[in-house]
From Swiss-Prot:
Region of interest called Disordered, as start-end residue ranges on this chain: 244-273
Protein name (record): Cytoplasmic phosphatidylinositol transfer protein 1
Gene Ontology molecular function: any one: phosphatidylinositol binding
Gene: rdgBbeta
UniProt keywords, alphabetically: Lipid transport, Lipid-binding, Transport
Native organism: Drosophila melanogaster (Fruit fly)
């Protein structure tokens, strides 16, 4: 059975504001989290169009993360290991898929929709009756849910952060019921790993990892609001291109990174359609 979790993450922003903040946060976060030989490599970033959702942006990334995996996963993975992320951004709706050429049974699908409310829509992404029966909902609080110690920075803690540009924050207990403006990211995550003996363990690991990333990323988007607020879409796309170039250079800055790039290309040529 595919594990289905719906994460609802409220932000003291409007949906239109978050369109800029999200792009800024992802670009900066990817650079900060990347190291020599490991991190998020942007392979493709181009406009796309869908008959239902209209014009959007397609992005493909290779996430090199061998040393960041738990030992029990490293034991079954090759030395050079990467996950393929494909994302179709038709804001305020996005679709993101994660696969791995080495582990064909692994698949993660994330459907996202953004609304100007505090997480009160009960079936925002139009799940079927069968999906609703197995769905669990997790309301993430960017101020009072804790991130791991290795990711915590006081200056990025919404309980202490005060925006000079927007005069928003610090966030107090119950802020999701009282603060305006407010918006919510609704994310439905389908995670499946159909390997007997490891399925439950891997699917739980994936969901925990996604929850941590969502919590950290949304905290940072708010904590960095004074840096991106007022940017146009053209401004943030230019920033995105700059940071993507810096991130790719950082990943491939050593011989190990170069080998990872070569091996990634070889794997991609051989295993991915």
């Amino acid at each position: 059975m595919v594990l289905i979790k719906e994460y609802r993450v409220c932000m003291p922003l409007t949906v239109e504001e978050y369109k800029i903040g999200q792009l800024y946060m992802i670009a900066r976060h990817s650079l900060e989290q990347s190291e020599e030989g490991e991190g998020v490599e942007v392979v493709e970033n181009k406009p796309c169009e869908d008959p239902v959702h209209g014009k959007g942006q397609y992005t493909e990334k290779h996430i090199h993360l061998s040393s960041r995996l738990p030992y029990w996963i490293q034991a079954i993975c090759p030395r050079v290991f990467y996950v393929i992320e494909k994302s179709w951004n038709y804001y305020p709706y996005t679709l993101t898929e994660y696969t791995c050429s080495f582990i064909p049974k692994l698949n993660v699908l994330i459907k996202t929709k953004y609304e100007d409310n505090n997480g009160s829509t009960e079936n925002c992404l139009d799940l079927t009756e069968d999906e609703l029966k197995v769905r669990t909902v997790d309301h993430l609080d960017i101020a009072f849910d804790e991130v791991s110690a290795k990711h915590y920075k006081k200056e990025e803690d919404p309980k202490f952060f005060k925006s000079e540009k927007t005069n928003r924050g610090p966030l107090i207990e119950g802020w999701r019921e009282t603060d305006k403006p407010i918006m919510c990211s609704y994310k439905v995550v389908h995670a499946s790993f159909e390997v007997w003996g490891l399925q439950t363990k891997v699917e739980d690991f994936i969901q925990r990892g996604i929850r941590e990333i969502l919590l950290l990323g949304h905290r940072q988007a708010f904590a960095w609001v004074d840096e991106w607020h007022g940017m146009t879409l053209e401004d943030v796309r230019a920033y995105e291109r700059q940071k993507q170039a810096e991130t790719n250079e950082k990943i491939h800055n050593t011989s190990g990174g170069a080998n990872a790039a070569a091996n990634a290309k070889e794997a991609n040529d051989g295993d991915i359609d």
